[in-house]
Amino acid sequence: MLVLFLLLTIPTRAQRTTTETPKTEFIFRGFSGNQSNIVTTGAATIKLDGLLRLTDRNSNVTGTSFYHKPVRLLETNTSSTNSTIRSFSTSFVFVIIPTSSSNGGFGFTFTLSPTPDRTGAESAQYLGLLNKANDGNSTNHVFAVEFDTVQGFKDGADRTGNHIGLNFNSLTSDVQEPVVYYDNEDPNRKEDFPLQSGDPIRAILDYDGPTQTLNLTVYPANLKSRPVRPLISRPVPKLSQIVQEEMYVGFTAATGRDQSSAHYVMGWSFSSGGDLLTEDTLDLLELPRPPPNTAKKRGYNSQVLALIVALSGVTVILLALLFFFVMYKKRLQQGEVLEDWEINHPHRLRYKDLYAATDGFKENRIVGTGGFGTVFRGNLSSPSSDQIAVKKITPNSMQGVREFIAEIESLGRLRHKNLVNLQGWCKQKNDLLLIYDYIPNGSLDSLLYSRPRQSGVVLSWNARFKIAKGIASGLLYLHEEWEKVVIHRDIKPSNVLIEDDMNPRLGDFGLARLYERGSQSNTTVVVGTIGYMAPELARNGKSSSASDVFAFGVLLLEIVSGRRPTDSGTFFLADWVMELHARGEILHAVDPRLGFGYDGVEARLALVVGLLCCHQRPTSRPSMRTVLRYLNGDDDVPEIDNDWGYSDSSRSDLGSNFEGYVSSDRASSSVPSFSVTRVSSSSVISGR
């Protein structure tokens, strides 16, 4: 009987168990070296000092940062189809620095999202998470804790501009509380504090799965101990209607038109499927230093100025002499002064740090030479981490100085997975330096030509097609998706760097130009590289997005064929491919080194799209958005019209009518350049 009882009860007990799912735990005490673990989009970026910046203080920008892998948040009960949310905890330290003490915005969120891609999310009150069309949709499956700093938006739902809310599929908060913490000595006493203080603030969120209770505590990070009483503590059964089996965890942020702040995360920990946090693991001493609070500094300077005015003349003179002496001494020690405009641009780095990182700019550190300078590989800390590329502009070159300023202005604000990130800059006497992400795989030029000659390894078709679509995506961002129109003007293989996963990054923006949307180029100086310049440049010298499309078309043909665009002025790649197309033999243009190792449909598609981009009339060329739709197979590719070609006289004009910078594609570079906000050239040349 005992045996029979056991046999009957064992299956019943088994049915009551839940499926064990692995725990997820991570902790980032700063984000240096963790670029592969954090997915950033928009204005978000990981800075050299280890800070995760969600937005800078530009107007109407968004930024998102998510952990790179989804987190399992549901426990499945094997006895039924019901699932319960796993307990989880997260802690993070953040800093918000407003444009001024009274004009910051809009805030940020900690988010559970079914995808890290928040494409279409709007700025301002939508916090980079949702938009006007989908705000409130039950299909969003989004939970967010909002840290809002602006009052009166979202149909007046925000009672105060300094508040925290719990949001379910909407940015209208179900639960909203002013920002306070409770004193441990008197748990009923509230201490309020501003989110936009510019000082580190700590947030700890605990969700208990069995009771469906959420506890949220927010307090200044310099407090000695965590407040015992949380700011928000309540059941949130609504969360079970939102959470899917796997969710992405991360942050979104946004600024507004007239109200903007820089949002930073100094450290972040997360745990699911285990015990809730009993103590915080983010020690301030182990985190990166908080960013400088220029809004606070401006208030301090006004007080100092009032004090100086009240002092006697002798005291004023002594203070002035002391000030200039200290500044002069700092200059001698290569100290760096952070100026207001640098808050929204890449930061200035110390020359001595770059000198040490490149072993004194030794020849064995050179990874490329081209344009106006030489590129060196460097290490800012240990030999295996924080690798950078340092472009040293050729001395005594005014063209080089102009390029230097252009790159600081533009690429410092552009952020896209197919563009090279500019990290910082430096000027020491006659040395001008730009610092980029280091991309060890080299340029597309070397992968197409140099490496096959040296090792016999030929770039595969899948890699070529992926590279082509990546470059197209980067150009689409420059032409249509950024706040202004950026014309690159020098698209070629040596200006495309390739990551280990064959993701391309377009660089070398020293010749780029920036325009307001709807305006046209006033520049009539012809610049670029022979073989990639559109025929209309010989007639009017005016670059446009259509001339960039032409250069991309030539590059696309080059990627497929493995042949350079010109050869001693007698061979023109586009004409040759067009002749093969006219004879119905266009696949004969495919790189013979590939053998039969390519997709014929994709190769034909790429070649025809390349020819469409090389049309003699700019108005007949497709936009980069259309090009990308062709390459992705979203739209049918039209026939090439009979007016495609252009005359030999146009070609000869391209070789003789130049008044600006024109190069042949013989220089190789491992790192590109950049250009965008107005920065005074005198301030850069003088070292400020």
UniProtKB/Swiss-Prot annotation:
Spans through the membrane: 307-327
GO molecular function: ATP binding; carbohydrate binding; protein serine kinase activity; transmembrane receptor protein serine/threonine kinase activity
Signal peptide: 1-14
Extracellular side: 15-306
SMART domains assigned: S_TKc (SM00220)
Regions of this protein lying in the Cytoplasmic compartment: 328-688
Record's bilayer topology term: Single-pass type I membrane protein
Chief localization: membrane
SUPFAM superfamilies noted in UniProt: Concanavalin A-like lectins/glucanases, Protein kinase-like (PK-like)
GO cellular component: plasma membrane
A biological process from GO: defense response to oomycetes
Keyword Signal on entry: yes
Catalytic residues (UniProt): D490 (proton acceptor)
Binding site residues for ATP: V367, G368, T369, G370, G371, F372, G373, T374, V375, K391
Gene3D superfamilies attached to this UniProt entry: 2.60.120.200, Phosphorylase Kinase, domain 1 (3.30.200.20), Transferase(Phosphotransferase) domain 1 (1.10.510.10)
Role of this protein: Involved in negative regulation of abscisic acid response in seed germination.
Record's protein name: Lectin-domain containing receptor kinase VI.3
Species assigned in the record: Arabidopsis thaliana
Organism classification: Eukaryota, Viridiplantae, Streptophyta, Embryophyta, Tracheophyta
